[in-house]
Amino acid sequence: MLMIRKTGTLRGRISALIFVVLLCWCPLTLWAAVDDAPAINPEIETELPVNPMAAAPPSLLEALRKIRALSFCGEAVPMERQDVRERFEKELLLTLGNRPQAILYLKRQLRYLPHIEAVLEKEDLPDDLKYLAVAESALIPDIRSRSGAMGIWQFMPDTGRNHGLMIDSYIDERRDFSTATQAAIAYLRKLYDQFGSWSLAAAAYNMGDNGLAADIELQQTNDYFELVLPDETE
């Protein structure tokens, strides 16, 4: 939720949803690349000519292109679409290209995601929703956006108050990870009931339900991957 820029220039742009999903898939993709490497027989290894390229595992992009199916909260991501796949590959490469940041993501996940997972399981909601917190705030608990959103779940003041968070000059429960998590999950359930899709619920969480409803009405589609949405939401 860090600085929304409304451009509306390209259809079918992929959103933070892809970034959310790829955080789950990165380790699997990397292991797949290693597992697919040609096996070396130690008995004949010394008899073979040295060819580093022949023994090298497939590139990351080669491993990525083997992925044929991907989903978010049980909803299929259309990886057969070139724009979707290209955005997925771009976001993954950008994430892995910044190794210090990628390491920080992994460390923060160990600290925060288990609690979110437990709450989602208790509420019988999709586990993938935990990655919205990563996309919203990079799991930085005291982060504040230019627009005034605060905390790991990036609640705006009015939205936070509407979902039971105490926000005044002395207390700001948006900074309280546990309390804000409960509020965020309740809000996501409400958005799913309103829009009937977790992809749309994730978009509405980022840009606001009124904004998404207006875009759906204006563009005459409720297909998440066809909607032209704010850059940050996409």
Name these PLM-found stretches.
Residues M79-E234:
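Catalytic glycan-binding domains that act on GlcNAc-containing polysaccharides
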Residues L2-I4, R13-I14, L22-D124:
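An acidic, Gly/Ser/Thr/Pro-rich helix-cap/linker signature
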